[in-house]
């Protein structure tokens, strides 16, 4: 299913500028997993910081603010994996509530396992998150499935979520992933509705799909997602597009045999975790994690 109208927000790496530098040089050092919210005449950006396996993995989630959406100052908040009692942190989800308060959803790895869970904390401002006050909102199942990287929106009076699921029953299959869709009246109690997007045999996304950003437009839904063809491409996923009229039934737009819609020009080609934030005045800013020439991952941005 081809639809060039859905390419409007695809990353163009040549137009990207650096937003957050990785915490070191070389493979395994990442700044990325962005979640952006336009507020207070600027952009709040939540992101994950990571070191290589054996050197800390996903060691912190930070939140920073920039008036221009590009030049972020020192973080207004930093949450460490030690504070969360987790082996590693992944992409956060920052949400502003209708009453002006804020929520931060955190993906947490259970030590010694492949299991992931999602916890949530709430505060009056992004600088005031206190993770001593938090709850598990998506527990997963330590023997059956890991749940992480939720993408959450409020639309038409309902909460929508697309979360990444990894199967755990077979140790050789835990790198596989699908995106499952859920709804909620409050963003806390979720009801799973089904598989929104899964890999296609023989295609560039055959090993797994992870929805990263979603846009509603009337009766249609467009999702930008990360995909990989093999376990070897873990950490170097690339970006594709899926569409549908139902948020639980998305169809990839790339033709059979075609590659991803966007990738890094460097090394493994990783270009993932795209996030879109609409700005006052009608423009949109893109944030995404992209592999650099030295193998590290930087958080970059574009303005459309």
Identify the residue ranges that each predicted region occupies.
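Beta-rich carbohydrate-recognition and catalytic domains
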Residues: 1-87, 95-207, 215-269, 278-304
């Amino acid at each position: 299913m081809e639809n060039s109208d859905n390419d409007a927000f695809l990353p163009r790496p040549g137009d990207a500028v650096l937003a957050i530098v990785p915490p070191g040089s070389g493979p395994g050092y990442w700044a990325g997993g962005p979640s952006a919210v336009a507020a207070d005449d600027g952009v709040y950006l939540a992101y994950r910081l990571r070191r290589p396996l054996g050197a800390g993995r996903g060691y912190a989630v930070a939140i920073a603010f920039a008036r221009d959406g590009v030049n972020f100052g020192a973080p207004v908040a930093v949450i460490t994996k030690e504070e969360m009692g987790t082996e590693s942190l992944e992409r956060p989800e920052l949400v502003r509530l209708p009453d002006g308060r804020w929520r931060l959803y955190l993906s947490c790895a259970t030590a010694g396992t492949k299991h992931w869970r999602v916890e949530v904390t709430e505060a009056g401002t992004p600088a005031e998150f206190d993770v001593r006050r938090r709850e598990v909102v998506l527990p997963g199942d330590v023997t059956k499935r890991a749940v992480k990287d939720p993408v959450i929106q409020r639309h038409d009076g309902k909460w929508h979520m697309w979360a990444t699921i990894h199967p755990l029953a077979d140790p050789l299959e835990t790198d596989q992933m699908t995106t499952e869709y859920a709804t909620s009246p409050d963003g806390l109690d979720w009801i799973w509705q089904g598989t929104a997007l899964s890999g296609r045999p023989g295609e560039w996304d055959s090993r797994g799909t992870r929805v990263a950003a979603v846009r509603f437009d009337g009766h249609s839904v467009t999702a930008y997602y990360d995909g990989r063809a093999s376990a070897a491409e873990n950490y170097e996923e690339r970006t594709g597009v899926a569409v549908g009229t139902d948020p639980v039934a998305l169809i990839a737009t790339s033709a059979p045999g075609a590659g991803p819609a966007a990738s890094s020009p460097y090394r493994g080609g990783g270009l993932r975790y795209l996030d879109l934030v609409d700005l006052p005045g009608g423009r949109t800013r893109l944030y995404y994690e992209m592999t650099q020439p030295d193998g590290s991952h930087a958080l970059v941005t574009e303005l459309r």
